[in-house]
Amino acid sequence: MRTERTARFEEAVRQLGGGTVEARMGAARTLVILADEWLADTVVTEHERHHQVQTIIDALCESIRSPFSLAYRAELWADEPTGDLQEQSRFYAERAELVAEAKVRRSILTEIHERVRWMTTKTVSQNPYAPLKTGDFSPGTWSGFAYDFSGTLFFYPVDFRGSCWGQGLNLSGCTHREDANLYGGPADFSGSTYADDADFFGSVYAGATDFSGCAYGGYTRFGGSLYREFVNFSGSTFGPYAGFISSVYRSDADFSGCTYTGYMSASQCAYHGRAIFTGSTYNSDTRLNHSHYSRAARLDSCTYKGDAFLHDNTYCGTFNASGCTYTNPASFDRCTYLQDASFVGSTFGHYFTGSDSAYYGRVAFNRCRSTGYVTFAGSIFHEEVNFTGNVYGMNLSVREAVFLEGVDCSNSVCHERAANFREAAFMGGVSFAGVRFVANEPAFDRCLFNSMAGYLFNVAMGSEHCIPMAAGCPSFPIGSRTLTEQGLIRLSSYRQSINRAAKALEVMTRRTGQDSPEVLEARTELHAASEALASWVRSLTAPDTAR
């Protein structure tokens, strides 16, 4: 039996390499039948079955990868020939040859596709936005083998939708339109070009996946996908739409150096490893909102030419958005930063909003320039804040913000409108040394200070406006308030509660991991302790409140 199959295999491979279209398609069909026969043969060992089928698949893939010179002739894709009669005759002959070659190759891919398709449960089918999990699908009979299509020019439609590539799929360096859906091993798409739409929605990638250096000319959907290992999209260019909505990244995700020509949305995502977006360019509106980052998030050195929506995010690791340029509004409202956050050296062509957020680590928002207003209204800062050397084109507002440690605003410039510090609470001291207020006096109505901390209110020598100070020693801005002795005691009590909750979160994270139920509960307790303090402080800035 083995000798007979070997002879059929060798003859089929010979015919597949040349001959008529009918002979080559027949040879491909023979190889497919041989593979199915080996899989059904229970007499030979599993290792032998796998080896024989992989050998057949390698031969089929080699046929797909083999170059075909006429596919690179752009004129053959025209509707009508050009030139004299001799050239027209050649056009029709070569185009017929090209169509015939495409027919052979499509038949091979169709046979492969039919045997790598996966089936999902009814529940998953009814909810296309739910990321697939391992138990939600069953693989095809050929899913457990490796496929190498690297460097292929797909000059015909390719349909890999609903496919399960269990041992890896290599599509690196390809030019094609491709709709692959489910991968079980390392998948390499690097350096590929997609001239039309590319749909990878609802995919599961069990191994490391490489999409680096790709070019997408049409609409691209990667949303609703699950990446179990490292995924690399770096250096890619996307067309009118790039969607990564509701995806889960179990390991590191690298989107660095990408260019988005049109709208980009990666909202409602979960990043369990590092998330790297460094050096990317967004030419239209961008949504990176409503997402969870378990480890470090790097969004530094990016350029946003449309509206930037980065609100309602949770950053459990360090956050770095330094050196960015925003042409339009940038929204960072209602975010939680559990570690240090940096916006150093960024430029805002419109307004920046970081309101109603919680910053548990140090914040660096220095050496920034803004044309519009900048607001951190209603936010709470648990560690030191650096606002030094900034230029505000309009006003700066920290109204109702709570600063528990020192705030350094020195050597900044506020141009149009008044800087708004109304009802803010500075519990750890603040410096306005060398600040220049150009248009109006800053407003400190019902602002709350801790008289035990250090303060510097001596603005720049050439400042058009000064901070209006009340009489007394120590002296504070007119309209502001200071904590009473009883208030200082309560502040200490609240901070002790926060420190205990933060310590419990740190211990639980080391013990159970970033995203365990115990850690989520500890984060909730820390947030509750922080909100309790903020609510108490804000009650002191209300009219006629005893402190």
PLM regions and their residue ranges:
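Transmembrane signal-anchor/signal-peptide helices with a preference for the extracytoplasmic
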Residues: M1-E4
